[in-house]
Amino acid sequence: MVKHVLFVKLKENTPEQCEKVKSLFLSMKDKVPMVRDIAVGIDYLHSERSYDVVLELVVDDREALEAYQVDPYHAGVVKPYIAEVRDGSTIVVDYEF
């Protein structure tokens, strides 16, 4: 199994924007076949070093993670939207467990 973790800072850190990003991330559970499990969290601390939204998703293996990256819904809908609303700052960690 591989876990993909993405931390995102948003240009507009409003509750509405955070919820929209959360909903979009969660929609991948039903639209991206290689996603086995998914969790999304919204930061409540809002410190200077905090990121606004975190995505954690699980896929079967490295090949599934590669397929996820080019999946039409992820690459064509989710990724472009996040690129538009993020402030340029993201952190990604991918690891096997």
Question: What is each of the regions a protein language model found here?
Answer:
Residues 1-52, 60-70, 93-97:
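Short S/T/G/P-rich N-terminal loop/turn motif that feeds into the first structured element of a domain
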Residues 70, 75-76:
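Long, contiguous binding/interaction regions
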Residues 80-97:
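Charge-dense polyanion-binding interfaces
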